[in-house]
């Protein structure tokens, strides 16, 4: 029997507001534990929440960027549950009137475009953070308690773990472009739970789902779903049934591990939040927020293809993060040729960032520095090989490309007299290579060029070396 995989994702995104959703407590990351909280966040008797307008507008902006319909009438509800990181014993969330519904984004997998529906986007407060010490104790930090969140729930339109990864990449990109969140999984500002089930191909009814939690990266989401897909298939083919469970992905064993069995859906006993009035969002407010949305990744990618003549793949890579796209545009504004700037960012820059596990903001390279180096290559002041030495200096220490070239004596040798001397020495020392070339072995030229570049410490002008070399061989 063949099965179809059905996946739905729930993504929590912390909003980058200056203060919390219902109090004036600040929201910096990494502050000393329990220093960024208040009696409102902790739910002391007699205190009342006040809704943060910026949080509402950030949620609206995110929902609009995800093609959601924005509610005119929306409200907040109490979600009741007990847990150590939830001091009020309830969370203020949205139940039946979310701020955004019926959205979608488009992903590309295997060269094919697919639309993934978004059921809803709702606004809520985050919980505190538990740290388990390993000696029987758990420590709780309430700094995060009350930080504004949006929960984005996808339709069960995702059919493969690869599609799930692509969906998360696209979702993160769009949210980052809006500026409402930095979406850093390592800091907890983007978190994801995945629901997965299998059903026989052709069957419309969904199978029993399992929920995957503690997914610390997009790669873990994909790996966890891949394992769970195989596990469920083996269970079903063995004649057993899938239990409704919550599981976690363990990277060490590369398996999903049972956390708890769920006998039914959770009953949070939602009821309208009595301390907050319903919220009315009129058309004027919607239009004002819509006008504040910047150019989104798909729009920027289309512009790069149409105006700069970039291949679709290059445009996609450059626009995946706003940080990279902005860096590219600033580099071009500083005088670099667009294609060269693109090549360096997709090549050497991305390779360095991946190897060091860093982002552009973490390195010393600036658009001015990269543009200056590219212009030196275009002018023939340095070769592409020398440029890699300059690039290493720029990305690790920063500075001005021209100044680095002069201080380190890296200017490309283009003086014909100097090059002729280098060519003559190479030919005198390698008579066999001359004979090999004359006998039709073109590789001999490559060897001779290599000897000349070695002698010049990589600074000889390659096109000029080739020209002089061929001329001198003819004379012998």
UniProtKB/Swiss-Prot annotation:
It is an enzyme of class 6 (ligase). InterPro entries: Asn/Gln-tRNA_amidoTrfase_suB/E, Asn/Gln-tRNA_Trfase_suB/E_cat, Asn/Gln_amidotransferase, Asn/Gln_tRNA_amidoTrase-B-like, GatB, GatB_C_1, GatB_Yqey_C_2, Gln-tRNA_amidoTrfase_suB_CS. It comes from Bacillus subtilis (strain 168). GO terms for molecular function: asparaginyl-tRNA synthase (glutamine-hydrolyzing) activity; ATP binding; glutaminyl-tRNA synthase (glutamine-hydrolyzing) activity. Its EC number is 6.3.5.-. Keywords: ATP-binding, Ligase, Nucleotide-binding, Protein biosynthesis. One of its GO terms (biological process) is translation. Allows the formation of correctly charged Asn-tRNA(Asn) or Gln-tRNA(Gln) through the transamidation of misacylated Asp-tRNA(Asn) or Glu-tRNA(Gln) in organisms which lack either or both of asparaginyl-tRNA or glutaminyl-tRNA synthetases. The reaction takes place in the presence of glutamine and ATP through an activated phospho-Asp-tRNA(Asn) or phospho-Glu-tRNA(Gln). PROSITE patterns: GATB. It catalyses: L-glutamyl-tRNA(Gln) + L-glutamine + ATP + H2O = L-glutaminyl-tRNA(Gln) + L-glutamate + ADP + phosphate + H(+); L-aspartyl-tRNA(Asn) + L-glutamine + ATP + H2O = L-asparaginyl-tRNA(Asn) + L-glutamate + ADP + phosphate + 2 H(+). Belongs to the GatB/GatE family. GatB subfamily. Heterotrimer of A, B and C subunits. This is Aspartyl/glutamyl-tRNA(Asn/Gln) amidotransferase subunit B. Coiled coil: none annotated. Pfam families: GatB_N (PF02934), GatB_Yqey (PF02637).
């Amino acid at each position: 029997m063949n099965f179809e995989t059905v996946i739905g994702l729930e993504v929590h995104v912390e909003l980058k507001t200056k203060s919390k959703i219902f109090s004036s407590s600040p929201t910096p990351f990494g502050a000393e534990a329990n220093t960024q909280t208040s009696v409102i966040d902790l739910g002391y008797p007699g205190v009342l929440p006040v809704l943060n307008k910026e949080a509402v507008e950030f949620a609206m902006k995110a929902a609009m960027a995800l093609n959601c319909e924005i509610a005119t009438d929306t409200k907040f509800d109490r979600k009741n549950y007990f847990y150590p990181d939830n001091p009020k014993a309830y969370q203020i969330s949205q139940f039946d009137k979310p701020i955004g519904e019926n959205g979608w984004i488009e992903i590309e997998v295997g060269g094919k475009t697919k639309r993934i529906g978004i059921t809803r986007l709702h606004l809520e407060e985050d919980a505190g953070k538990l740290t388990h010490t390993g000696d029987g104790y758990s420590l709780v930090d309430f700094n995060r308690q009350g930080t504004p969140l949006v929960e984005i729930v996808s339709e069960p339109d995702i059919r493969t773990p690869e599609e799930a990864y692509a969906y998360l990449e696209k979702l993160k990109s769009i949210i980052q472009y809006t500026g409402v969140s930095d979406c850093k999984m390592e800091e907890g500002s983007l978190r994801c739970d995945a629901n997965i089930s299998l059903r026989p191909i052709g069957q419309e009814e969904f199978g029993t789902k399992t929920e995957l939690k503690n997914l610390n990266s997009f790669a873990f989401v994909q790996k966890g779903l891949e394992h769970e897909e195989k596990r469920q298939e083996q269970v079903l083919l063995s004649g057993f049934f899938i239990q409704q469970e919550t599981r976690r992905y363990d990277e060490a064993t590369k398996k999903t591990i049972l956390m708890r069995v769920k006998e039914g859906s959770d009953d949070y006993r939602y009821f309208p939040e009595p301390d907050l009035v319903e919220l009315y969002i009129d058309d004027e407010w919607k239009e004002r927020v819509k006008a504040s949305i910047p150019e989104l990744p798909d729009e920027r990618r289309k512009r790069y293809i149409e105006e700069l003549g970039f291949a679709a793949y290059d445009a996609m890579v450059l626009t995946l993060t706003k940080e990279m796209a902005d860096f590219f545009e600033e580099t071009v504004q500083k005088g670099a040729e667009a294609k060269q700037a693109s090549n360096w960012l997709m090549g050497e820059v991305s390779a360095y960032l991946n190897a060091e596990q860093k982002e552009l903001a973490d390195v010393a390279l600036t658009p001015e520095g990269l543009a200056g180096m590219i212009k030196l290559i275009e002018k023939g002041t340095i070769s592409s090989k020398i440029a890699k030495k300059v690039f290493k200096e720029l990305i690790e220490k920063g500075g001005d490309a021209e100044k680095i070239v002069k201080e380190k004596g890296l200017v490309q040798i283009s003086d014909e007299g100097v090059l002729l001397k280098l060519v003559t020495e190479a030919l005198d020392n390698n008579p066999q290579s001359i004979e090999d070339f004359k006998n039709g072995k073109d590789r001999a030229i490559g060897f001779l060029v290599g000897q000349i570049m070695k002698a010049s410490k990589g600074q000889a002008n390659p096109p000029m070396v080739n020209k002089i070399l061929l001329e001198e061989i003819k004379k012998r």
